[in-house]
């Protein structure tokens, strides 16, 4: 990255400030909708909550936002960018060269973050819609019935997920202004209610946070941290969205967002101090603090904020999955780019999965209070994994002093470990749903990663130099018809002149393929997100071209587009003869036709393999049946493509023993 690019990344602008509002802070910005409500319920409701519990909980929220969100993520994690990209997989690409085991926290953290993508839309939208109960007309019509809330929430989620296929560039332009209004609303209403009881400002003193955890008045004990953690669940998303808005814009906008959020919590706390001990039923402090004439406006604004938060999380899930695919941690899925920019992704399988999961969660849990019981567990896991990777980044990549690295690891593992322990109790109260989703994603990741290792273990290679003479003779053999001018093989294994033996089997044995030029193309995914480079080795010929493509993990792997440029460059440099065409609608065309060959390896002799390896490879074959075809993944859907099935030659597996049965008559003859 050049100087100007780095300068732009670290620079803050007015437009970037507004854009950050709509992209980065959706999740953490909607937490005031449900965090205090969860804390109040955990303390036995409004009738039983004590002053110590209110001020202590506020103190815990303030210092959680300060230590985890501000210190860990805004001050430290944002510096760990991979060519201006953030998130757990970008962090992993920076440190994976230091230890192989780092793939484990990367996969666990990624799976947990993806599972959270199903719960967050359900919680935020349901919490916002439940505000309708504060409107007298709605309350008179439906009372405390939850069914209308569920139906409205499901309808909003349906619309939200259905519009993903069309892109979000148009509506995305209003996300920033709407969220700026939302945060201003939080800050102003919080400040107004703060005048009701300034004693809540005692919460700035961390003494009250520690005092609450040790106080007998704390009816939830250490598990109050499970509710407090809801205030900072969006911190991981803040890091993941680094590449969309830049470090400078986050550094400038976060203080404004943090102040507005804390004012909202303090306003709710002041109202709770004034009304504790009253019998008001199940209330949400967020809506309870508002005057009646603002309820409808607040519900509409909260719903818009919840939708924007959900949209940001959905888009983040698409990006996370696309990164995992290119890092070979997930199978290839169909990816579309409906927007005007590369960053706008749409993955139908992920969209459908999130929609079904979010809808199931709404129907299963019914209310936001029940959903909150399951919320946060997955994110505590992701944060612990990020802390692990950040520790390696600081010690090995940044060469920070060991004492400081040890201090960082100890402090945040301890804090996040407490949050994890407090959230773990949620497992039996609905947290198991998110854990099951995360476990399923992790299972697929583990299978895909391990199968890739086994593929290279059992794949045979041959030296192209040993077959150059045969290939040259074949392309000049008049007894064979020309198969195609250019035959292109896509290979996962090519090391200089060494290549997958199955490719040579396809050219020479299966049906000799006469061509003028044989191309062997391997795609190498780099740790830098936007790399676009290639290397060519023609092995001293003018008919064999070995191409290594180096593409960043954010780049689309559209082979024909890159190959077109490479062919032109080789012909212009004289390394590749021109392929003048007699018949063409393009006068003077110098490049012939192309045929792409995709080899699909099928497992053979599976019974002779170790049981675990057999299970991994057979499971991968089943998963591949529902994933995107290689032709579509490599942008070949408008090209001529042949898919051939070849056996996966297991070089390390012994042949089955068999003996000839000789009859007595044959013995006599011999």
Swiss-Prot record:
This chain's source organism reads: Lactococcus lactis subsp. lactis (strain IL1403) (Streptococcus lactis)
Compartments, as annotated in UniProt: Cell membrane
Its membrane topology, per UniProt?
Multi-pass membrane protein
Q: Tell me what this protein is called.
A: Probable potassium transport system protein Kup 1
* Function description: Transport of potassium into the cell. Likely operates as a K(+):H(+) symporter.
Pfam families in the record, alphabetically?
K_trans, K_trans_C
Question: Could you tell me the superkingdom of the organism this chain comes from?
Answer: Bacteria
Instruction: Write out the entry's keywords from A to Z.
Output: Cell membrane, Ion transport, Membrane, Potassium, Potassium transport, Symport, Transmembrane, Transmembrane helix, Transport
Gene Ontology CC: one annotated term:
plasma membrane
Q: Which reaction is the catalytic activity of this chain? A: K(+)(in) + H(+)(in) = K(+)(out) + H(+)(out)
Predominantly, its location class is membrane
What family classification does the UniProt entry report for this protein?
Belongs to the HAK/KUP transporter (TC 2.A.72) family.
Spell out where the chain crosses the membrane.
14-34, 58-78, 101-121, 147-167, 175-195, 196-216, 220-240, 252-272, 294-314, 345-365, 374-394, 403-423, 427-447
């Amino acid at each position: 990255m050049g100087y100007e690019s780095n300068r732009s990344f670290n620079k803050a602008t007015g437009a970037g400030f507004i854009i950050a509002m709509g992209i980065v802070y959706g999740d953490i910005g909607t937490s005031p909708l449900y965090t205090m409500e969860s804390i109040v319920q955990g303390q036995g409701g409004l009738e039983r909550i004590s002053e110590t519990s209110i001020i202590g909980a506020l103190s815990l929220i303030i210092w959680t936002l300060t230590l985890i969100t501000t210190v860990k993520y805004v001050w430290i994690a944002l510096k760990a960018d991979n060519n201006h990209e953030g998130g757990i997989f970008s962090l992993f690409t920076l440190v994976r060269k230091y230890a192989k085991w780092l793939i484990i926290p990367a996969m666990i953290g990624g799976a947990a973050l993806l599972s959270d993508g199903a719960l967050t839309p359900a919680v935020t939208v349901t919490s916002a819609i439940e505000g309708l109960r504060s409107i007298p007309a709605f309350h008179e019509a439906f009372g405390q019935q939850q069914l209308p809330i569920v139906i409205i929430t499901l309808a909003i989620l349906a619309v939200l997920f259905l519009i993903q296929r069309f892109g979000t560039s148009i509506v995305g332009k209003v996300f920033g202004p709407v969220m700026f209004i939302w945060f201003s609303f939080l800050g102003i209403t919080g400040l107004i209610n703060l005048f009701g009881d300034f004693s809540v400002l005692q919460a700035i003193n961390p003494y009250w946070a520690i005092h609450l955890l040790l106080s007998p008045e704390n009816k939830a004990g250490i598990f109050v941290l499970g509710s407090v953690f809801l205030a900072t669940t969006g911190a991981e998303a803040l890091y993941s969205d680094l590449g969309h808005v830049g470090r400078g814009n986050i550094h400038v906008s976060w203080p404004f967002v943090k102040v507005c959020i804390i004012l909202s919590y303090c306003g709710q706390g002041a109202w709770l101090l004034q009304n504790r001990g009253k019998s008001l039923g199940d209330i949400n402090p967020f809506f309870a603090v508002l005057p009646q004439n603002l309820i409808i406006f607040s519900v509409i604004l909260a719903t818009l904020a919840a939708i924007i938060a959900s949209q940001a999380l959905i888009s983040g899930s698409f990006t996370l999955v696309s990164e995992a695919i290119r890092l070979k941690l997930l199978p290839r899925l169909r990816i579309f780019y409906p927007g005007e920019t590369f960053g706008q992704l749409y993955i139908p399988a992920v969209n459908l999965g999130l929609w079904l999961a979010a809808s199931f969660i709404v129907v299963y849990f019914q209310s936001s209070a029940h959903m909150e019981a399951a919320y946060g567990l997955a994110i505590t896991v992701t944060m612990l994994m990020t802390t692990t990777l950040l520790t390696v980044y600081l010690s090995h990549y940044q060469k920070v002093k060991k004492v400081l690295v040890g201090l960082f690891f100890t402090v945040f593992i301890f804090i996040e470990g407490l949050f994890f322990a407090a959230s773990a109790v949620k497992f039996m109260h609905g947290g198991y749903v998110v854990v099951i989703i995360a476990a399923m994603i992790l299972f697929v990741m583990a299978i895909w990663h391990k199968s890739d290792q086994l593929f290279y273990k059992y794949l045979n290679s041959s030296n192209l130099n040993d077959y150059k003479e045969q290939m040259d003779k074949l392309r000049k053999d008049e007894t064979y018809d020309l198969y195609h001018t250019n035959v292109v093989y896509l290979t996962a294994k090519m090391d200089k002149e060494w290549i997958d033996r199955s490719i040579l089997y396809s050219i020479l044995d299966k049906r000799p393929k006469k061509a003028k030029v044989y191309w062997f193309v391997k795609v190498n995914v780099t740790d830098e997100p936007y790399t676009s480079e290639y290397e060519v080795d023609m092995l001293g010929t003018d008919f064999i071209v070995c191409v290594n493509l180096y593409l960043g993990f954010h780049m689309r792997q559209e082979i024909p587009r890159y190959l077109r440029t490479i062919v032109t460059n080789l012909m212009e440099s004289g390394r590749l003869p021109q392929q003048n065409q007699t018949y063409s609608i393009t006068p003077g065309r110098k490049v012939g036709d192309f045929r792409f060959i995709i080899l699909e390896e099928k497992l053979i002799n599976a019974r002779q393999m170790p049981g675990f390896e057999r299970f991994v490879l057979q499971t991968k074959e089943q998963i591949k049946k529902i994933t995107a075809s290689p032709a579509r993944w490599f942008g070949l859907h408008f090209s001529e493509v042949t898919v051939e099935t070849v056996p996966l030659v297991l070089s390390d597996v012994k042949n089955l023993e068999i003996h000839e049965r000789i009859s007595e008559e044959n013995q006599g003859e011999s």
